[in-house]
Regions:
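A boundary/linker detector
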Residues: 1-24, 95-123
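A generic structural signal for ordered alpha-helices
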Residues: 8, 12-16, 30-31, 48, ...
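A general structural-boundary detector
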Residues: 17, 25-28, 53, 57, ...
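Short cysteine-rich loop/turn motifs with clustered Cys
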Residues: 20-48, 70
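Acidic, low-complexity intrinsically disordered regions
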Residues: 22, 30, 78-81, 99
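Histidine-centered nuclease catalytic patch
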Residues: 39-68, 77-87
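Short microdomains enriched in Cys/His and/or Lys/Arg
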Residues: 57-72, 89-104
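Low-complexity, flexible helical/coil segments
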Residues: 74-91, 103-111
Length: 123
């Protein structure tokens, strides 16, 4: 099963029939994509989901805006812009920083044509 862009996509694709279960499934898939470790410090315990751009600052519940995060990092970061907060941490890792930046990149546009469109030969 793939990871969808939001909990609502799990409902739309009939992976589940309740919004609560869709959100649980979405959160579980995000943690799985991060190998069940905190995106910031690498801890494996007390994992939560963190909005990279906090909802209070306009962040949304989309996969590209959330990462697997330990409880301590989530509480410490709070509403601080993530880069400002992360650069000030003693556990800062350039590799983890790059991985988060890569995660945040939008997906490439989907090619809607499954086959080459026909040319109109009428001239």
């Amino acid at each position: 099963m793939e990871i969808y862009s939001s909990p609502q996509q799990y409902l739309y694709n009939l992976e589940t029939l309740s919004s609560a279960e869709a959100k649980r499934l979405w959160r579980r898939k995000i943690k799985q994509m991060w190998n069940y470790e905190c995106a910031y410090c690498g801890a494996h315990s007390h994992l939560t989901i963190d909005h990279i751009v906090p909802r209070s600052k306009g962040g949304i519940d989309f996969t590209k805006n959330v990462v697997s995060c330990c409880y301590d990092c989530n509480q410490d970061k709070a509403h601080t812009p993530w880069e400002e907060w992360y650069f000030s941490q003693e556990f800062f890792s350039l590799n983890r920083y790059k991985k988060i930046k890569e995660w945040m990149k939008p997906d490439p546009p989907v090619n809607l044509f499954l086959y080459r469109p026909r040319r109109n030969n009428c001239t």
